[in-house]
Amino acid sequence: MSNVFDSDSPTNLAEYSVSELSGSIKRTVETAFDQVRVRGEISGYRGPHSSGHAYFALKDDRARIDAVIWKGTFSRLKFRPEEGMEVIATGKVTTFPGSSKYQIVIETLEPAGAGALMALIEERKRKLGAEGLFDAARKKRLPFMPRVIGVVTSPTGAVIRDILHRISDRFPVHVLVWPVKVQGEGSGEEVANAIRGFNALEPAGLIPRPDVLIVARGGGSLEDLWSFNDEIVVRAAAESRIPLISAVGHETDWTLIDYAADVRAPTPTGAAEMAVPVKAELEAQAAALAARLQGCMNRQMDQRRQSVRALMRALPSLDQLLALPRRRFDEAAAGLGRGLELNTINKRRGFERVGAHLRPDLLSGRIAERRQTLNERIVRAERMVERLIDRSKSRIDRAEAILASLPARFKTQTDRSREALANLSRHGDTAIRHQLARARAELSAQDRVLQSLSYKNVLKRGYAVIRDEDDRPVSQAAALSAGSAVSIEFSDGRIGAVTTEGGAPPASLKKRPAREAGDPPKQGSLF
């Protein structure tokens, strides 16, 4: 400062340089406003700078003042400043001589009453609700019996101990704890990152993915619970693919994460109770259900047993079931033998009648036809017998199938009946074979008789058969005239010939003397 007495100034006012005046103002302001409380609305807040300091302004409807929160102070704040929030800032006013500006250096910051915070919460609730983050359709059902539970909370304190103790008492399962800060600067980001981190785990990874999440914190003031009203936390909870239980504060404390979570628990202990059932209760329910099931099974068995007894009483006995098939089988077996015998007799008689009128040269063809017919009838008879036997066996098999469901006391009777049927079948087969053998033997004997009567056997003894042009046998010489063409059949074939004379035998042929009685014939008899 210059000496006022040496100055030539016409006034008594002191003269200051710009620096002197700025420094004097700075000292005056900092002395007068060394500790002040300012109420205003946060404006121009963009979060902490890269240096860690936060720069913004406090304003009301008529004025505005710049504000700064240094890095060390910012980390100790109980809640995170937000644009438009009405707060009460405590600090000191300072100026910058180089720019003639002043600002308040904030040392503590608190909301301007619960009403301001609640108004901010309501505004944020309306905004997020309009996006559908709180819709009931987004809510997921909690798993009945989770294998792994993820807990997002502070690793120290009573909350995690209460949750672990409650889960261990009710139904011990694997618990994964993601430690986070639950209040203060950066706590909201940590909670949101923990929720997203659990969702990023692979179901079959080294660290198992939880089946349900619990986001928990103990009770506190509205400022203490403010991190769970952060938009980043609410969005992470709404986007979680894992069912999420919010357990923040006490039953009367509501935060925005409670609306985005799938289920809200009144306390952290209540969240543990919602996450797992009571093992003892499940065991008791299982035992009760097992007892009911056993009772139902016993009643069903009794009813089925009574039904079987009633069916057994209604079923006929084994002898009654087999009586009709056995009688039919006996009748078929008896009638078959008699029928074959009568058929053989009738065929023999018919053969004898027909054979008396047939020429020897036609006997062989008729015999072949009869033999074929007889063989066909024998085959049909055998097939008929087989069908009768198969039919009887099928009926008995059906009867056995019906009786298979009856108690074991009928098994012995069934075995005896089966053995008797087998004996009857064997005896019937034996009788039929004997009848067929006798029929074949008789047929062979008749065949031999017919062969012996055949004229071809006579031809083998030196005789011949003469046939006219129409292939009719010629039995008298008068039937031929001179020049007639004839065929002569010998035992080894035929030759053609022409007659030279007709009528009586020629005179050159002398009559042979008659064979004396007792002389043996030189040629065998035709018969």
UniProtKB/Swiss-Prot annotation:
Record localization: Cytoplasm
Major site of localization recorded for this protein: cytoplasm
GO biological process terms on file: DNA catabolic process
Enzyme Commission code: 3.1.11.6
Molecular functions per Gene Ontology: exodeoxyribonuclease VII activity; nucleic acid binding
Any one cellular-component term (Gene Ontology): cytoplasm
Catalytic activity: Exonucleolytic cleavage in either 5'- to 3'- or 3'- to 5'-direction to yield nucleoside 5'-phosphates
Key word GTP-binding present: no
InterPro entries named in the record: Exonuc_VII_L, Exonuc_VII_lsu_C, OB-fold_nuc-bd_dom
Keywords: Cytoplasm, Exonuclease, Hydrolase, Nuclease
Region of interest (Disordered), residue spans: 496-527
HAMAP family recorded: Exonuc_7_L
Similarity-based family: Belongs to the XseA family.
Main function: Bidirectionally degrades single-stranded DNA into large acid-insoluble oligonucleotides, which are then degraded further into small acid-soluble oligonucleotides.
Assembly with partners or alone: Heterooligomer composed of large and small subunits.
Protein name (Swiss-Prot/TrEMBL): Exodeoxyribonuclease 7 large subunit
Organism expressing this protein natively: Rhizobium leguminosarum bv. trifolii (strain WSM2304)
